[in-house]
């Protein structure tokens, strides 16, 4: 591609540089935790119903479920980046929006799956121009949670003619959605660690669904769950 074409049609990666470090943020927060911490849950807060292990598993699943589960026909017309059998382990029918626990239980296995999902994401970010990403759309089912989540999207969200609701997103908004999911679930992991008296490791950017007005983003008191 000529230099003029590179200038006029920049890669989508230029909008999302954090994809080149986001899996390392996850790894930094969870890799040294023992099983008691990884599997701690509480019904005291809505965000603590899922354990740190489950939050991490969910993050590994999100990019794959979106980029392959919803975008495959537009992004991977020639060959999918993983087999259908492999995909089914990232979108387990027996585990809610996360990896198959039977195959991904040890935290290092889950983190390797996060790496795999982000690798696929980066391939798309490099192979797709911003112009093309703005011309592509998929739609999701309407929900009360999505009505709150979409308020943090400055653009890329449009009307679904079938439902009359703002539930369609272009590829830019999809990558922003995945990134917001990561930020918010890392934030949840940090909240769990604070509640257990463990210092968080990474500094998150000022972004994520937990920044939406109306989202429960209250941080627990240090060691509050002990």
PLM features per residue range, with description:
Residues 175-197:
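A hydrophobic membrane-anchoring alpha-helix module
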Residues 50-64:
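Extended cationic-aromatic binding surfaces that line active-site or macromolecule-binding grooves
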Residues 46-49, 104, 111, 179:
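Short, solvent-exposed loop/helix junctions and linker helices
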Residues 17-20, 24, 57-60, 112-115, ...:
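Generic structural signal for well-ordered, non-transmembrane alpha-helical segments
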């Amino acid at each position: 591609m000529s230099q003029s074409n590179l200038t006029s049609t920049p890669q989508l990666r230029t909008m999302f540089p954090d994809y080149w470090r986001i899996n390392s943020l996850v790894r930094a927060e969870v890799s040294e935790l023992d099983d008691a911490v990884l599997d701690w849950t509480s019904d005291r807060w809505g965000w603590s119903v899922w354990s740190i292990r489950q939050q991490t598993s969910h993050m590994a699943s999100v990019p794959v479920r979106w980029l392959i589960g919803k975008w495959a026909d537009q992004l991977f017309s020639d060959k999918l980046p993983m087999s259908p059998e492999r995909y089914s382990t990232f979108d387990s029918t027996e585990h809610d929006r996360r990896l198959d626990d039977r195959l991904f239980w040890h935290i290092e296995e889950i983190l390797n799956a996060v790496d795999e999902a982000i690798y696929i994401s980066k391939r798309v970010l490099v192979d797709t121009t911003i112009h093309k990403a703005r011309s592509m759309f998929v739609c999701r089912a309407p929900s009360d949670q999505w009505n709150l989540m979409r308020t943090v999207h400055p653009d890329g969200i449009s009307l679904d003619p079938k439902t009359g609701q703002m539930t369609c997103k272009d590829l830019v908004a999809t990558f922003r959605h995945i990134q917001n999911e990561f930020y918010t679930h890392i934030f949840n992991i940090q909240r769990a660690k604070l509640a257990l008296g463990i210092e968080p490791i990474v500094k998150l950017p000022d972004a994520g669904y937990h920044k939406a007005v109306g989202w429960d983003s209250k941080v627990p008191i240090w060691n509050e769950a002990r």
